[in-house]
Amino acid sequence: MTTPTTLKYAASHEWLSEDGTVGITDHAQEQLGDVVYVELPEVGREVTAGEAVAVVESVKTASDIYAPASGRIVAVNEELSGNPELVNSAPYEGGWLFKLEVTEEGSDLLDAAAYDAQAH
């Protein structure tokens, strides 16, 4: 799967869209294996870039998901409660995790080329 060039990426394998949507990268979901549960943050919670805010559990492991930007959680992907496998099948579309009202982007976000270079 090609890494979308319209997104920004954290070295910890999260992506951030222009509208504040956050998910994990295709590389991350491949490393995790089959996702069986996603623990999402509470809507309204204030988060800081780099803070652990969610957990993705797979058959292999559980992995913390970090906020790629500071802001307030304004939505979570309710679809994941019944369909956590969306994180595997559509990491950049239906498998998004939460949306932020961004107050400040993380200073170390990468473009697609830089992310691909460090992820592989």
UniProtKB/Swiss-Prot annotation:
It holds the Pfam family GCV_H. One of its GO terms (biological process) is glycine decarboxylation via glycine cleavage system. NCBIfam families: gcvH, PRK01202.1. Residues 19-101 form the Lipoyl-binding domain. PANTHER family: GLYCINE CLEAVAGE SYSTEM H PROTEIN, GLYCINE CLEAVAGE SYSTEM H PROTEIN-RELATED. It comes from Deinococcus deserti (strain DSM 17065 / CIP 109153 / LMG 22923 / VCD115). The keyword tRNA processing does not apply. InterPro entries: 2-oxoA_DH_lipoyl-BS (IPR003016), Biotin_lipoyl (IPR000089), GCV_H (IPR002930), GCV_H/Fam206 (IPR033753), GCV_H_sub (IPR017453), Single_hybrid_motif (IPR011053). This is Glycine cleavage system H protein.
